[in-house]
């Protein structure tokens, strides 16, 4: 499992859910929406570790 996603705070989890719901409302499949948000979270986490 992805440690980046496992270490999210409750607030970050809620934000991710909201982003996924917005993408689904725009017509993106739930699986694709989850993949998009997960990648965004990984990218954000990676950038913060590079600092």
Curated annotation (Swiss-Prot):
Superkingdom of the source species: Bacteria
UniProt-listed InterPro entries: UPF0181
Coiled-coil portions: none
UniProt record similarity statement: Belongs to the UPF0181 family.
HAMAP family membership: UPF0181 (MF_00507)
Protein name: UPF0181 protein HAPS_0710
Species of the source: Glaesserella parasuis serovar 5 (strain SH0165)
């Amino acid at each position: 499992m992805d440690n980046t996603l496992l270490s999210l705070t409750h607030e970050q989890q809620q934000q991710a859910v909201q982003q996924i719901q917005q993408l689904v409302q725009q017509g993106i499949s739930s699986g694709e929406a989850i993949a998009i948000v997960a990648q965004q979270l990984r990218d954000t986490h990676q950038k913060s570790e590079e600092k």
